[in-house]
Amino acid sequence: MKKPVVIGLAIAAIVAVIAGGTWWYQSRQDDGLTLYGNVDIRTVNISFRVGGRLASLNVDEGDAIKAGQVLGELDHAPYENALMQAKAGVSVAQAQYDLMLAGYRDEEIAQAAAAVRQAQAAYDYAQNFYNRQQGLWKSRTISANDLENARSSRDQAQATLKSAQDKLSQYRTGNREQDIAQAKASLEQAKAQLAQAQLDLQDTTLIAPANGTLLTRAVEPGSMLNAGSTVLTLSLTRPVWVRAYVDERNLSQTQPGRDILLYTDGRPDKPYHGKIGFVSPTAEFTPKTVETPDLRTDLVYRLRIIVTDADDALRQGMPVTVKFNDEVRHE
């Protein structure tokens, strides 16, 4: 056999082997389950927990955001004033509670005792005057009205004496437990108001809750905002999830933890890798976004696939082809 013929046969054999191997690989690739899904759209609406005038925003749409980053601030002044008032309230309540615990000073007790002596003298005088008036009334020297006035003065002096005696007794025995408990409760209430004022002031600073990309900027500085009004919308970029749906007959192939290959139109020959992270326990009618025609009238189960080697080319909402072929487990 001539040498050119031998070379030609060898080349033909090599081509045949390559073609056969390609056919075998593709047939093996097509043997497994194929689903169609989308990269999950995950967003967070960011807002202030308190209301007020928006003083500043530090980010624009498209900016990369880091968790803990300061995004903007409200006008602090009203909340700083409220904090000062709350601190003063705690000081007043603390002083009152300390007074209740300490009881009364010796000077106050001495003043109360002097008031009792003064009230006692006034009462004694009023009682003696009333006694004299009684004698005069019996001898018809004064009128009944004069006697009644003397009795009224005596009764008033007696009430004043009783009040002074009670006050002296309180000063000597100290404050009642109920009064001390009430003062303590007032102090705790003032401390709670202070803590809330501190939290409100802290909440005038808008902090990023997670890493992501700023999707929308809904308001501008100078706007008056209510608590909870959306200021920014953040698109969460990590972790990347793919949402897909599987019918009941293929449900057994979708155990959590199974390795998956994910293909996009932009990378048809270079798949992403992922793992099944969640399989819905309940069936639902196929969402309109599912691209597979033969699933649209079925009851299906939702899958969440966690992409383990995601990059910035894998965008939210992007359609993805999900491959469950057996070779995935060994890649």
Swiss-Prot record:
It comes from Salmonella paratyphi A (strain AKU_12601). InterPro entries: CusB_D23, UPF0194_membrane_YbhG, UPF0194_transport. This is UPF0194 membrane protein YbhG. The keyword RNA-binding does not apply. Belongs to the UPF0194 family. Residues 1-19 form the signal peptide. Residues 107-208 form a coiled coil. Pfam families: HlyD_D23. It is found in: Periplasm. It comes from the Bacteria. Keywords: Coiled coil, Periplasm, Signal. GO terms for cellular component: periplasmic space. The gene is ybhG.
